[in-house]
């Protein structure tokens, strides 16, 4: 039985009855929710315990906006981390029992072990010469180093500039720009040419094909009235980014047409130059790259796209099934070229490309509805765009391979205008 003195001493303690807060063992002393046990010196829930373990030793919050007098919301929600940490400390939570650096992984030890490992790694050809293991060949000596093959294409740039300035070779009058481009495509393909089978592809053949491709694109674009209204600088810049996309699509379209008409065999690729209709077996042609690299094709196999031939075959088969008309093919060329140029140059070029694509899309709609009497054409356009997507994806993959080859200094080829040959 308690004595009166002990009872009176208890009532006269420093804490008044109004300031005493009694907590149940089942209630978190911080937020008032259901507790999980005693953590770091106080009865708390798991959320408050985790918060204190995470923030108890850091205390790197933004300062409280209410001078540490925030009101706590119901259901355990806190809007202010400093005030929540202060309440944790007020109820007796302490960092004395925190355990630091108990993980078996130590960054300092790992760094020392890594340095020791590198010191013990023996020199290989790759580490000694500074070249990748992807090319299994030692670096040549200074006497064996071959100077870069410099190719001046200024004459070609001047020819392309003159073509753009002079305009179309044949004046045409058509209902809209898309049909004019289709007629321009027929004019560029022109007369029948002598067939020629290419069995070897070297420097002269490669540069000749590039030159013919760029000239064809420049002549074809002169039949695009909206394009001709741009400044000469803008036309020249866009041509540099469009010619490879156009030539890739034109080559596959000609190959599909040649196979359908049985002009070439089913495993051949066909295109045309100014004077000849050329054909080649991709897997049988002899390729000479000694003029641009000191490595052989076998050594450069990693930098080649091994699946390119198979993907080209899929595109050719799709074109043989769809048999696009010249109007559809012209739209495909414009869409692929403008989309790529806009994505490459951005800014003003992107705005121009989007405006041209919208105009040509309206012309294609008129062509289907009024000329072809085909109001339900969405599925056909979708199949045509699948072909364009395949070609654009191949070009982007080729760009990655080209950049990788440039990093490893695989080719000793240098152009006077390198921006023209980024997408080879």
From Swiss-Prot:
Q: Which residue intervals make up region (Disordered)?
A: 1-20
**InterPro entries, A to Z:** C.elegans_Orphan_NR, HNF4-like_DBD, NHR-like_dom_sf, Nucl_hrmn_rcpt_lig-bd, Znf_hrmn_rcpt, Znf_NHR/GATA
Q: Which SUPFAM superfamilies match?
A: Glucocorticoid receptor-like (DNA-binding domain), Nuclear receptor ligand-binding domain
- Keyword Metal-binding listed: yes
Report the stretches of sequence that form zinc fingers (NR C4-type).
Answer: 28-55, 64-88
Keywords, A to Z, come to: DNA-binding, Metal-binding, Nucleus, Receptor, Transcription, Transcription regulation, Zinc, Zinc-finger
Give the compositionally biased regions (Low complexity).
1-19
Q: Where in the cell is it found?
A: Nucleus
Is Cytoplasm given among the entry's keywords?
A: no
Q: Which family does it belong to?
A: Belongs to the nuclear hormone receptor family.
Please explain the role this protein plays, according to its UniProt record. Orphan nuclear receptor.
Record-given protein name: Nuclear hormone receptor family member nhr-55
Gene that produces this protein? nhr-55
């Amino acid at each position: 039985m308690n004595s009166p003195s002990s009872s009176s001493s208890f009532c006269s303690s420093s804490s008044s009855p109004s300031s005493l807060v009694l907590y149940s063992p089942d209630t978190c002393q911080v937020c008032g929710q259901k507790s999980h046990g005693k953590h770091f010196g106080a009865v708390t829930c798991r959320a408050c315990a985790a918060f204190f373990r995470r923030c108890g030793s850091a205390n790197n919050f933004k300062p409280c906006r209410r001078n540490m007098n925030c009101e706590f919301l119901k259901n355990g929600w806190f809007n202010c981390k400093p005030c929540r940490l202060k309440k944790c400390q007020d109820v007796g939570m302490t960092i004395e029992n925190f355990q630091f650096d108990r993980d078996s992984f130590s960054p300092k030890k790992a760094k020392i072990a890594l340095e020791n490992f590198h010191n013990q790694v023996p020199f290989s050809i790759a580490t000694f010469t500074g070249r990748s293991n992807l090319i299994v060949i030692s670096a040549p000596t200074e006497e064996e180093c071959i100077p870069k093959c410099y190719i001046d294409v200024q004459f070609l740039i001047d020819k392309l500039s003159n073509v753009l300035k002079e305009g179309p070779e044949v004046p045409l009058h058509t209902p809209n720009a898309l049909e004019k481009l289709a007629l321009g495509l027929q004019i560029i393909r022109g007369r029948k040419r002598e067939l020629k089978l290419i069995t070897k592809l070297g420097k002269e053949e490669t540069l000749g094909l590039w030159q013919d491709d760029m000239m064809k694109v420049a002549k074809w674009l002169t039949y695009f009235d909206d394009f001709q209204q741009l400044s000469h600088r803008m036309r020249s810049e866009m041509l540099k980014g469009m010619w490879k996309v156009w030539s890739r699509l034109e080559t596959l379209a000609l190959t599909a047409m040649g196979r359908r008409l049985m002009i070439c065999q089913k495993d051949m690729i066909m295109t045309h130059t100014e004077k000849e209709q050329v054909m080649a077996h991709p897997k049988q042609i002899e390729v000479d790259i000694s003029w641009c690299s000191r490595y052989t094709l076998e050594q450069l196999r990693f930098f080649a796209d091994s699946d390119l031939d198979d993907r080209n075959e899929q595109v050719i088969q799709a074109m043989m099934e769809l048999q696009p008309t010249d109007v559809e093919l012209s739209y495909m060329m414009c869409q692929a070229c403008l989309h790529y140029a806009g994505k490459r140059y951005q800014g003003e070029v992107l705005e121009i490309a989007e405006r041209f694509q919208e105009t040509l899309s309206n012309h294609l709609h008129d062509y289907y509805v009024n000329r072809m009497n085909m109001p339900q054409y969405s599925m056909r356009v979708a199949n045509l765009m699948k072909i364009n997507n395949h070609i654009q994806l191949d070009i982007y993959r080729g760009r990655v391979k080209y950049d990788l080859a440039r990093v490893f200094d695989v080719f000793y080829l240098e152009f006077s205008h390198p921006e023209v040959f980024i997408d080879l």
